[in-house]
Design a protein with these regions (language model features):
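A structural motif
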Residues: 82-92
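A general secondary-structure signal for short beta-strands and their flanking turns/coil
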Residues: 61-64, 81-83
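Extracytoplasmic/periplasmic/luminal assembly and interaction segments
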Residues: 64-78
């Protein structure tokens, strides 16, 4: 049975040059979420979001409150993001989907898209509809989707693990 966990956190996105995935900084944790961070990295305040690492976690290990500040390295000017929502969908202790949404402009979305192109290579799929701007990459067995909702003015990241 799938369990949907929504974790609301505040975030700052600092755009600087770097060739790695986004990293979470300044994490204030509660319960087993602390162990979750320690398992990913011995320095929980500088812990990368690593989809491959968190696949094995069970529902009880991850349904915990947390507050974090995130740095997204993009070689752009600093931008403050008001909120971020992390969604983790679990089935039989394996994560099927990992997504989070940021309140930001389409300009910020395009900056993130260009940064991901530098990190992951050319976009596999790209489309612009009346509802939003969509693009995706394939990273091994993981599909990374980046979309911008015109109505909500939100950028959403989604990881689908196959």
């Amino acid at each position: 049975m799938k369990k949907l966990i929504i974790l609301a956190v505040s975030v700052f996105a600092l755009f600087t040059s770097c060739q790695q995935r986004p990293q979470v900084f300044g994490v204030y944790i509660d319960g087993t979420f602390e162990q979750f961070l320690k398992d990913l990295d011995k320095e929980p305040w500088k812990c990368p979001i690593n989809i491959d690492t968190i696949q094995h976690l069970s529902e009880s290990e991850i349904s915990i409150k947390a507050f974090s500040t995130e740095v997204i390295d993009l070689n752009e000017d600093s931008v403050k993001v008001d909120s971020i929502y992390i969604t983790i969908e679990l089935e039989k202790e394996k994560i099927k989907q990992f997504s989070y949404t940021l309140d930001m402009s389409e300009t910020d979305f395009k900056a993130i898209q260009h940064a991901y192109e530098r990190i992951y290579g050319s976009v596999k799929y790209h489309d612009i509809t009346e509802y939003g701007n969509y693009c995706s990459w394939m990273i091994g067995k993981t599909s990374l989707w980046l979309s911008y909702d015109f109505a909500e003015q939100q950028t959403k990241y989604e990881y689908f693990i196959y």
